[in-house]
Amino acid sequence: MSQRLDIRGYAIVSDDDKIAGLDGLTPASLRNEKDWDYYQRALDRADLIVFGRRSHEAEPNVRGHRRLVVSREAAGLERRTDAWWWNPGEMSWPDVAGRLLPSGGLVAAPGGQVVFDLFLKIGFDEFHLSRAHGVRLPGGRAVFSACEAGVPVESVLAQGGLRLSERIALDPAHGVEMNVWRRAL
């Protein structure tokens, strides 16, 4: 593939860097209207949206976006009725991107943890990290697997070659801010 990809992650986390509760689902305490609107506008601009299986199932594709679902149950890269499905253990990202985005484009990766870990290794160009202050989810699912071991999300992003480049007071009345991390040049 000769054209450039722009890979962007999107997550809202609790104070303890969690994206989901004990049940694996995003709790109401992490849902914020202004964050949701920002996120939906970002997805509308994307040429491809990459979800994990659970995130794909939890977020119906009512807008008809082009989706890629990461799952060990897929055979390489396969087209199903609801989306493209990809098993990274059977086909490389460059091969998938070359097939689905031969001219390059914007890739949105909104999770979950498996997708975030995968694209941290592949290389995010940006990561839009919203935080819902005052929310804690003990025992919940962390944004990155390294956060499960106590590594702060900011350290994970910095170790992944990103730097904090922008702070957005997304919804101060509800304690939600966004930090945009971009690839260090």
Regions found by a protein language model. Give the residues of each.
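Enzymes that bind and transform nitrogen-containing heteroaromatic metabolites
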Residues: 1-185
